[in-house]
Structures are given as C-alpha cells and as structure tokens.
Amino acid sequence: MINGNGNGVCVPSTHTNRLRLNPATNHQPENYEDLQLDFSPALFASLERYLPPAMLNAERQVKVEYMMEILRRYCPDGERIRAQRQREYRQKIITNYQPLHRELYTIHASSFFVPSFLKAINENLAQSFRSIMSEPSPGIYTFDMFQPQFCQMLLNELENFERWVHDSKFRIMRPNTMNRYGAVLDDFGFETMLDKMMDSYIRPISKAFYPEVGGGSLDSHHGFLVEYALDRDVDLGFHVDDSEVTLNVCLGTQFCGGELFFRGVRCEQHVNTDTQQEEVFDYSHVPGRAILHRGRHRHGARATTSGRRINLILWCRSSQFRELRRYQHDFSSWCGECHRHKKERQRQAVAAAKVELMKIEGESAAAAEPAAV
C-alpha cells in the first residue's frame, strides 16, 4: 500500500497491525522529535519497542504509519484534538521561556543522583536496590536519590518559570485537578529528561518490586512539581494517583508538617473501602529523599503548617498493564481488599472441605460398627 503522501513508502496492511505483548528492551527506538505528529514523540519512542520483530529495523516513516494506524484505532477524535492542543500549548511555552539552568534538561547522572543510588542502578539487581532502601510499610520504599545541588537548581528553575509566567501573564495548566499551585515539568521542556529518568532509573526498580502492576513495562509519564505553604496549597485530600508507580521526591525547602499518610492499595471497585490497621502508615518528607509506591496506594498529605515544601512527582504508567486490566476481574495480587476476599473464600472452602471430610469419616465409622443384637 502507498501512503497518502505519494512518496512510495510501503506500509503494512492496517488490518494486521498489531503490537507484541512484551517490549524489545534492548532495542534503541528512533527519535521522533522533529516530526509533526498527532501524538507525543515520546509515545512513539515508547511504542516502537512493542513493534513486531520484523518492523523494528524498518524505515522510520514505515514505523510511524504502522503505529499511527494503531493509535487512531484506539484513540477517539476528541482525544487527538486534545493532544494537538496540548502540543501547541507546550510549543508556545518552549518557544518563549528561557531556561535558567539548561543543564537540567538532559540527564547528567553523577550531578543529579547520589552515588549509592547510581551504584544500585548500575548493578541492576533486586538485592542492590534493597541495600539502599527502607520498606517501612509493605510496597512503600524510601531511599536517598537526588544530590542537594540538583534539588536547589530545580527549585531555582521553578522560581524562574513562575516569574516568567507572572511577567508574561501566561495562563498555565496546573499539575492535576487537586493542586492549584505548581507546574507540569513536561510542559516547559523536561519531557525527554523525565522519560529517560523513568526508563533508565525508575523502571528497573519497578520491574523488581512492582511486576504485578506493570512495573517492568512503564512507557509513559506525567511529571510535575507541587508547592505547599500557607499561601499555596496547604494539604492534599485522600486519593489515588493516575499511575501504576509513583515517585515522590522532596526538593525542599524549610517546612513543618506535610506528612504523607497511606491507607492501603485498592482497585477501582474497592477504592472507598475501610482501612485495615496494618495498612496505616505516615511518612515525613526529607529533602533529596524519594518515596516510591503503587499509584493505587491510597494516600494524602497533611497540612504544611509553616515554611514552604516543594516536591517532584513522577507518575509512571504502563499502557500494557492498563490494557490487560480491562479484561481482569481479580486484582488480589495487589489490591488489599481483593486479597482479603480471596483469603476469606479460601478459608471458607477449607472449612467446608473439613466439614465434608468429617461427615464422610463419620458415615464410614457408622457403617463399620457391628449391628446391634
């Protein structure tokens, strides 16, 4: 088939376009930043790893057409229009905003991360990750991650961006529906850097600790900064994140309060169920220190009573997990309530089997007794 541009590029039949279940992790995807596409270039780079083996080394335009057909099949027109507007919004910011620290926009591992974290990542073993981490509550991991100078530079970059927003009277989108302050890092040039952070630093850890929620197939992200102070957002209500895995790192500065409170992992059906005592956990932020948890782990933030707290948050998502989840009904491998229901069903089944066994044994014993004379 010849594509619509009439340039003679052969594109596989749209009726057979499929993705494979597991990504080609060793494959280096193309760079799509220079193309005018209906979707984010980062999405194409992530999706490329799921192309059939025969497609991986095809010409870039062939791969683009192949992936576009799949995306159009599943993405409504309204979603494409929204994505187009978001791209235009981001381009307007990137064209006009002058970064303060351009070195932040590309990963410089030794400048960004503490040595212990880098060592564990380079070894890429579960025991190496555990050696630098604490697990104060099941499924919640804390560890030192960022260098102090990186935290300070990112804080300075946020202040510079907010100053530009104020001076230019540019109306920006906030990180989510719950935070009225802060900024989406992806919107002012950090998308590629954060994608690299997810791919090379968060996904290896998530693959080891969160395989049941797609930790090994994370392929997109939403990265943002949030601000808490008496004249900013003060606290954050009880919620779950729109992510499979969430990285939350305190950048500073001086503050009191702001503790995170966790209340158990839940699927959509059980998100409003009661908390069990063993699921209660509170966490106090430390600048430079990260906390990693499942996105479906219910949590909130207590009031910041003085000072100013700023956190970097990276929601990491897996399109593969989300697609598979649509066809699943049992989430007992990660939902606390599903797990309790499953254990209760097992307990009842064992109890019923014991009763039945005792009944059979009683009947056998009665049959074996000699008849009364």
What residue ranges belong to the model's regions?
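Fe(II)/2-oxoglutarate
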Residues: 1-138, 334-373
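Catalytic core of non-heme Fe(II) oxygenases with the double-stranded beta-helix
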Residues: 2-4, 207-337, 370-373
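Non-heme Fe(II)/2-oxoglutarate
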Residues: 3, 101, 105-216
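Short, functionally important structural connectors and interaction interfaces within domains
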Residues: 27, 92, 105, 137-138, ...
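Generic preference for well-ordered alpha-helical elements
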Residues: 40, 44, 60, 64, ...
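A broadly tuned preference for mixed-charge, low-complexity surface segments
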Residues: 196-202, 209, 300-302, 306-318, ...
